[in-house]
Amino acid sequence: MKVLIQRALNACVVVDGETIGAIDHGQLVLVGIEKGDTEVDTQRLADKLLKYRMFGDEDGKMNLNVQQVAGGILLVSQFTLAAETKKGLRPGFSTAAIPEEGERLFNDFVNKVRAQYSKVETGRFGADMKVSFTNDGPVTFMLD
């Protein structure tokens, strides 16, 4: 499981011309589910995401997590994070979870984040989504 978190001034996801999720200041989180991932992974990464200190304190040091700054979280499934890219010039997706398992684990991850924090929005699993955001910093981290 790979979780790409980006500190955002704002972010939104649009499906079929309709905004289905949007946040102001907070985190845009892209989530890739891989074969072999389990609920243990979703719990570990939900906990880490919520506690990850990527926001500046009064001295500008990355010392605060998303909850401490009352930021929003926009969770978006992105199976391409599970791509194999070491060989060739085209990504392979044999390491990505099958869609049914990916959706189940993505929803489990969403539920675990929401159980600990209320300011959570999501995209739509498997949909053709248009994601827009303003990266603050830029600040981007890969959690796995």
UniProtKB/Swiss-Prot annotation:
Query: Cytoplasm: is it a keyword of this entry?
Result: yes
Q: What is its EC number?
A: 3.1.1.96
Please tell me which stretches of this chain the record labels as motif Gly-cisPro motif, important for rejection of L-amino acids: 137-138
Please give the name of this protein: D-aminoacyl-tRNA deacylase
Q: What does this protein do?
A: An aminoacyl-tRNA editing enzyme that deacylates mischarged D-aminoacyl-tRNAs. Also deacylates mischarged glycyl-tRNA(Ala), protecting cells against glycine mischarging by AlaRS. Acts via tRNA-based rather than protein-based catalysis; rejects L-amino acids rather than detecting D-amino acids in the active site. By recycling D-aminoacyl-tRNA to D-amino acids and free tRNA molecules, this enzyme counteracts the toxicity associated with the formation of D-aminoacyl-tRNA entities in vivo and helps enforce protein L-homochirality.
Q: Which domain of life is it from?
A: Bacteria
What this protein catalyses is: glycyl-tRNA(Ala) + H2O = tRNA(Ala) + glycine + H(+); a D-aminoacyl-tRNA + H2O = a tRNA + a D-alpha-amino acid + H(+)
Where is this protein found?
Answer: Cytoplasm
Q: What NCBIfam families does this protein map onto?
A: D-aminoacyl-tRNA deacylase
Please give the Pfam families that the UniProt record associates with this protein: Tyr_Deacylase
Q: Does the keyword tRNA-binding apply?
A: yes
Q: Which enzyme type, at the first EC level?
A: hydrolase
What's written under domain? Answer: A Gly-cisPro motif from one monomer fits into the active site of the other monomer to allow specific chiral rejection of L-amino acids.
InterPro entries attached to this UniProt entry: Daa-tRNA_deacyls_DTD, DTD-like_sf
Which Gene Ontology terms of cellular component type are present?
cytoplasm
Major localisation: cytoplasm
Family to which this protein belongs = Belongs to the DTD family.
Q: How does it assemble?
A: Homodimer.
State the Gene Ontology BP annotations: D-amino acid catabolic process
Keywords in alphabetical order, please.
Cytoplasm, Hydrolase, RNA-binding, tRNA-binding
Q: Which Gene Ontology molecular-function terms are recorded?
A: D-tyrosyl-tRNA(Tyr) deacylase activity; Gly-tRNA(Ala) deacylase activity; Ser(Gly)-tRNA(Ala) hydrolase activity; tRNA binding
